[in-house]
Amino acid sequence: MWTQKWHKYYTAQVDENDCGLAALNMILKYYGSDYMLAHLRQLAKTTADGTTVLGLVKAAKHLNLNAEAVRADMDALTASQLPLPVIVHVFKKNKLPHYYVVYQVTENDLIIGDPDPTVKTTKISKSQFAKEWTQIAIIIAPTVKYKPIKESRHTLIDLVPLLIKQKRLIGLIITAAAITTLISIAGAYFFQLIIDTYLPHLMTNRLSLVAIGLIVAYAFQAIINYIQSFFTIVLGQRLMIDIVLKYVHHLFDLPMNFFTTRHVGEMTSRFSDASKIIDALGSTTLTLFLDMWILLAVGLFLAYQNINLFLCSLVVVPIYISIVWLFKKTFNRLNQDTMESNAVLNSAIIESLSGIETIKSLTGEATTKKKIDTLFSDLLHKNLAYQKADQGQQAIKAATKLILTIVILWWGTFFVMRHQLSLGQLLTYNALLAYFLTPLENIINLQPKLQAARVANNRLNEVYLVESEFSKSREITALEQLNGDIEVNHVSFNYGYCSNILEDVSLTIPHHQKITIVGMSGSGKTTLAKLLVGFFEPQEQHGEIQINHHNISDISRTILRQYINYVPQEPFIFSGSVLENLLLGSRPGVTQQMIDQACSFAEIKTDIENLPQGYHTRLSESGFNLSGGQKQRLSIARALLSPAQCFIFDESTSNLDTITEHKIVSKLLFMKDKTIIFVAHRLNIASQTDKVVVLDHGKIVEQGSHRQLLNYNGYYARLIHNQE
């Protein structure tokens, strides 16, 4: 009873690392607001590891709330020294970092909101809470500027236009179903004629004629059933295109920071979420238009047969509704729980398969299998709980249906004995009763499907709410506008609310210059390179990057990446032919001669020619049939086939032998019409470029030519000395 008072403020986490965001939204609901978790995620700068306490404080302040993280103990909580509700950081079950919202403190218990949808708003004993609490609390209260805001949420109703688009197909399905229903009613009525008319009067000719007609009708019904099933499959596929492909396309349009703050399994698990939405949309459409029609048509016929038996049959309706209501909350909780467990398992499997080489080299198979076994067992356990609830509901409905059938026959027999109903009418009524109860069951069965779809739709919308990096209108939309110097002006950058990776970096890279960025691991070299190509953006009011005096925030992301080609240390090779990999992102009109030249340039042409089918040789996923050096050379050739005028090679030759590396680097340096940026540990490359930029702890400590920096005898000179 006490928990019901607070349940209206409850918010469930969508993904495993959303617990802090859900807790924050519970506080926001208490103060009259309601935000989408995707919005709060951006404000709190949530990463794949979750949300920090600092992130929650910053997000709350951004929404005009006073927020302060404090350290407290049970005495302070019990003595009401902490204003409630309050967010607390815990180690759930003494191992999982998590957040609760404490709503109320009683003599022996606390009323908490747990973002875990399997728990929700509940009581927890003070002793158990004390074991889990890290004694960190976040006190939040509105400021004078605070105004409640309730963000609109997309619901399943928003998907109705997808169904309207398929109205012709849906109309054909409904028409086919109407025809088959009429034939079924006619078939049931035939039994009444046999018993009440043909048998008593020995009407053999009429019996044969009607029987042959019904055989033809049933054959026609089979054809119509096939057509209806085919159209239903087509409807499902068209909805799949509108929902699943739309989600895939949106994923590819999202900015890079979306992928760095989420697990792959969280994204892939939403494909199965989409199938739940499609199932619900298809079922809802057919049920509303088809089953409702059948229910009405058969119901009228049954009422015509015997109104008393029909009224008896209607008793099942409130019983079915009660069954649905009893299972509603259970299905909602179990659906959310199963989807989350599936996402966690997918992430673990994908991560393990991606790192299989490391697992095998460390003989970590047993540990990995144990981890996956645990997650798989958890998913099976939660899926079993869902299936138990579903089968329990189905069993109750089946029992109700059987009991009703017996009651109808029992009561109907009395009508026959009193000559108020013929035997044929009773048998016909009983036969048609199934056609009445089946659509009624279909309507009732919508409940778990719609609940699963609602949860799945919420999960999909959390991704759709992340803005595409291509949605913003940008001024620069032509490559020709970018031919000029690259300027980095006082740029600072960090990931989340961590300390700065780059600190007040200023750098000018003249057009067609060749430079090398060097520094120890973690100095910010790769981060700077990714900022140049627009994978991440500098913090607001913390500097800017310009190309030919155009801020890169004003440059179309497609044009920016066509102008600057970033080649990472670990290039990704896609499953497909060598040629398909080379042509990915290539400039228009690439000829075989150009491909040969690029491959010769990258010292990979001979290797390709030695493959079984040359350029048409199929490569496995991630290029497992290529060496690390071959992958790097292939990626360099691929970059040379792009329209890029500037190349960033981020340790892109680290797996090459020194002779091959020297050949390729020398050729790159000879490209007078290209800007070349090397990010390197091997300082022999730095000695060949026009300029060397030295980074240390996110700051440029030195820059100049190789000779100038050696003469300066500073940080760079020490790096050279240590490498020798």
From Swiss-Prot:
Domain named Peptidase C39: residues: 13-140
Q: Name one GO cellular component term.
A: plasma membrane
What is the organism lineage in this UniProt record? Bacteria, Bacillati, Bacillota, Bacilli, Lactobacillales
- This one is known as Pediocin PA-1 transport/processing ATP-binding protein PedD
The chain's coiled-coil residues are none
Family label:
Belongs to the ABC transporter superfamily. Pediocin PA-1 exporter (TC 3.A.1.112.2) family.
Q: Which SUPFAM superfamilies match?
A: ABC transporter transmembrane region, P-loop containing nucleoside triphosphate hydrolases
The UniProt function text for this chain reads:
Involved in the export process of the bacteriocin pediocin PA-1/AcH. Is also essential for pediocin production.
